[in-house]
Structures are given as structure tokens and as C-alpha cells.
């Protein structure tokens, strides 16, 4: 069993990275292998709408996206994290989401467990709408969407932070990220029985 966590932040060591890693640590404590991927240091290019992925099952753009999609396909669970950008995901994560179209052919992510993390500059700073965008992505890929586990049990990991490292002091954000990891681990184990 394996879960990958992808931070869509342009900052390699920002608050989104911190919360995605927090969720992955909770998953690892449940005996599941984890891998962290930061999009900050990846070469990512936008979809150009050429439809080659529909014809050939693979995107013709040569960058780091293909390797990430391969890891998503091989994983049992996927956590996607993003800072809030105008109520939605970062450009980096949106490029990965848009370029995942080859995996939708044949629904290659079907029944994988998906969880979301979002970090905003204030407590009600668009985290839930950003998570909703990630959940929509999971649903379109026919994945199983989970939120954070009890006792918080909402949409996913929701952090507050402006400067890198601020989330270290966000007890609620850390708790929701850990609870998300526990829920992803729980459902992955149920599916893999």
C-alpha cells in the first residue's frame, strides 16, 4: 500500500508542504508507505488543448508531469495540497490537474482514495473552495473522496499561514491534516483488504 502527497505550492518549504507532510506522517504511522512530491521544483507546462492524449493516451509535452502521473497511477491514495489562490488551487497544481487527462482515459485513478489540503492567509480564506476544487478533480477521475477524520471531520486539512512556517503554530490546521492522513489510511486499508 502506498499514498503519495503532492504539494502544489510554488514554495518548496511553505505551509502547504508542511501540512501535506503532516498528513503523510499520520499515514506512515499506520504502516503505509508514503512519498512526498513538491511541484515547486518541477518543470510543469500547461495543457495546450491538442487532444493528442485522447488519440495516443499520452501527453506529447515533455516535462515532469508524465513521471508524476505515473506515480499517481501506481498509488493507492493521493493527497493533493494547495495554497489558496483567489479561492482555488495554485497554477502549479492546476497544470498537473489539467494534464492528468491521459489518466482519465479508462479511469485509471478509479477507486483510489483522495484527500485534500489547503492553506489560506486567514481562517476563512478560501480553504474550503480550494478543497472543493480538488474534490471535484478526484470525483471526475472516479476516485473515492475523503475528508479529515473525527473529531474534526470536515473537508480535509485546512491551514492558516501567510509566511512560510506559520502553520507550525496552527494547531487546528495541523490537527485537520493529521486527521485527513488517518482517514486516507483507514479507507486505503479497507479497500486493500
Swiss-Prot record:
Q: Where does [4Fe-4S] cluster bind?
A: 47, 50, 53, 59
Tell me the cofactors it needs.
Answer: FMN; [4Fe-4S] cluster
How cofactor binds (record note)? Binds 1 FMN per subunit.
Q: Name one GO molecular function term.
A: 4 iron, 4 sulfur cluster binding
Which keywords accompany this UniProt record? 4Fe-4S, Flavoprotein, FMN, Iron, Iron-sulfur, Metal-binding
Where, by residue number, does the polypeptide cross the bilayer?
Answer: none
- Specify the domain of life of the species encoding this protein: Archaea
Q: Pfam families in the record, alphabetically?
A: FMN_red
The UniProt family comment states: Belongs to the SsuE family. Isf subfamily.
What does this chain do?
A: Redox-active protein probably involved in electron transport.
Q: Self-association or partners: how does it assemble?
A: Homodimer.
Q: What is this protein called?
A: Iron-sulfur flavoprotein MJ1083
Annotated organism of origin: Methanocaldococcus jannaschii (strain ATCC 43067 / DSM 2661 / JAL-1 / JCM 10045 / NBRC 100440) (Methanococcus jannaschii)
Amino acid at each position: 500500500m502506498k499514498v503519495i502527497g503532492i504539494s502544489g505550492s510554488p514554495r518548496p518549504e511553505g505551509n502547504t508542504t508542511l501540512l501535506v507532510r503532516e498528513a503523510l506522517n499520520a499515514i506512515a504511522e499506520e504502516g503505509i508507505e508514503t512519498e512526498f512530491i513538491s511541484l515547486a521544483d518541477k518543470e510543469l507546462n500547461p495543457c495546450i488543448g491538442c487532444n493528442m492524449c485522447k488519440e495516443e493516451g499520452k501527453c506529447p509535452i515533455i516535462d515532469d508531469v508524465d513521471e508524476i502521473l505515473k506515480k499517481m497511477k501506481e498509488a493507492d491514495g493521493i493527497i493533493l495540497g494547495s495554497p489558496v489562490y483567489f479561492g482555488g488551487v495554485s497554477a502549479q497544481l492546476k497544470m498537473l490537474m489539467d494534464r492528468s487527462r491521459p489518466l482519465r482515459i479508462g479511469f485509471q485513478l478509479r477507486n483510489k482514495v483522495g484527500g485534500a489540503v489547503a492553506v489560506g492567509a486567514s481562517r476563512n480564506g478560501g480553504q474550503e473552495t480550494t478543497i472543493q476544487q480538488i474534490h471535484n478533480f478526484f470525483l471526475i477521475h472516479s476516485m473515492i473522496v475523503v475528508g479529515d477524520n473525527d473529531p474534526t471531520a470536515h473537508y480535509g486539512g485546512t491551514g492558516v499561514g501567510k509566511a512560510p512556517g506559520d502553520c507550525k503554530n496552527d494547531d487546528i490546521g495541523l490537527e485537520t491534516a493529521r486527521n485527513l492522513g488517518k482517514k486516507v489510511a483507514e479507507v486505503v486499508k479497507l479497500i486493500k483488504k
